Amino acid sequence: MKKLVYSAMCLALCLVLPFLTGQIPEIGSMLLPMHIPVLLCGFLCGGGWGAAVGFTAPLLRHLLFGMPPMPGCISMAFELATYGFVVGLLHRKLGKGVKGIYVSLICAMAAGRLVWGIAQMAIMGLNGGSFPFSAFVAGAFTSAIPGIVLQLVLLPILVRALEKAGVKA
């Protein structure tokens, strides 16, 4: 029951946090506000719940608010589902130390970006377009550097604080 409640809170954060950057979409695509609650859900609740929240969040947010726009929300759903699943799985396997948190986080971020690129390539291919490697690098890494740094700084602090406070799902 706790996992359901924590997952629902993370999903709600996915819906609300982008409003902080919503007036300037470029800032939202740089700070990646939906990624943090998904990764946190994976850390707290495990890979299955993290994947469910990650896949649902961008699609639900698109249905409710029109953002992120189609077809980007589809590739984002696969990306965030991968984040939640991988970080939850690795965190359970590697333990709760700072090193385990960072390894889980970095591996999840790399896997999620790879899945995002594959999904973008598939979507663009279905629409008769192409998705060159330069677009992948720009979308997955170059424009996302501030969000990547934010995640690498904020999430280990949050996870350690919640673990020390005894928050467990």
List each model region and its residues:
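Alpha-helical transmembrane segments and their cytosolic interface
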Residues: 1-11, 98, 131-169
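Hydrophobic transmembrane alpha-helices
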Residues: 1-44, 48-49
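Short helix-perturbing small/polar motifs within transmembrane alpha-helices
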Residues: 5-16, 53, 75-121, 159
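Interfacial aromatic-anchored transmembrane helix boundaries in multi-pass membrane proteins
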Residues: 16-31, 56-90, 124, 134-135
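Alpha-helical transmembrane segments of multi-pass membrane proteins, especially transporters
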Residues: 34, 39, 53-57, 71-76, ...
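Structural signal for the C-terminal ends of transmembrane alpha-helices
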Residues: 44-48, 89-94, 161-165
